[in-house]
Amino acid sequence: MARIAGVDLPRGKRVDIALTYIYGIGRTTAMKILDTTGVNWERSIDDLSADEVNEIRKELEQHYKVEGDLRREVSSNIKRLMDIGCYRGLRHRRGLPVHGQRTHTNARTRKGPRRGAVGKKK
């Protein structure tokens, strides 16, 4: 089992699909990485040699921000927005949609479960 960027890539999967298990790598980025390293995307993870795995690992470390570093950067960007008090930061702080979506209806995922109305006391 190949381990790249702290992630165990699943055995038996094609290389382009297996790379998407790394946070921050999608299909397009995976194909770019495989093109620059010269690894065939149709091959399985099991078929890769140690040199090819090291080549992919080196490409990721040099040119891409993935996993912990990327998560840290995203959370620090959100924290910065909240600290400066801009509109997007306030929306993050209140747990509401950030990109201008309507909230009168919808936005249940972002707002959380509904609070029920208080019933009439007997």
UniProtKB/Swiss-Prot annotation:
In the UniProt record, does the keyword Ribosomal protein occur?
A: yes
> Which GO biological process categories is it annotated with?
translation
Gene Ontology molecular-function annotations: rRNA binding; structural constituent of ribosome; tRNA binding
Q: Which InterPro entries match?
A: Rbsml_uS13_C, Ribosomal_uS13, Ribosomal_uS13-like_H2TH, Ribosomal_uS13_bac-type, Ribosomal_uS13_CS
- Region ranges (Disordered): 95-122
Q: Name one Pfam family in it.
A: Ribosomal_S13
Q: Which domain of life is it from?
A: Bacteria
Keyword terms: Ribonucleoprotein, Ribosomal protein, RNA-binding, rRNA-binding, tRNA-binding
Q: Which GO terms describe its cellular component?
A: cytosol; small ribosomal subunit
Concerning SUPFAM superfamilies, the annotation shows: S13-like H2TH domain
State the oligomer form and interacting partners. Answer: Part of the 30S ribosomal subunit. Forms a loose heterodimer with protein S19. Forms two bridges to the 50S subunit in the 70S ribosome.
Q: What is this protein's function?
A: Located at the top of the head of the 30S subunit, it contacts several helices of the 16S rRNA. In the 70S ribosome it contacts the 23S rRNA (bridge B1a) and protein L5 of the 50S subunit (bridge B1b), connecting the 2 subunits; these bridges are implicated in subunit movement. Contacts the tRNAs in the A and P-sites.
Record-stated family: Belongs to the universal ribosomal protein uS13 family.
Q: What is this protein called?
A: Small ribosomal subunit protein uS13
Originating organism: Desulfovibrio desulfuricans (strain ATCC 27774 / DSM 6949 / MB)
Primary gene name: rpsM
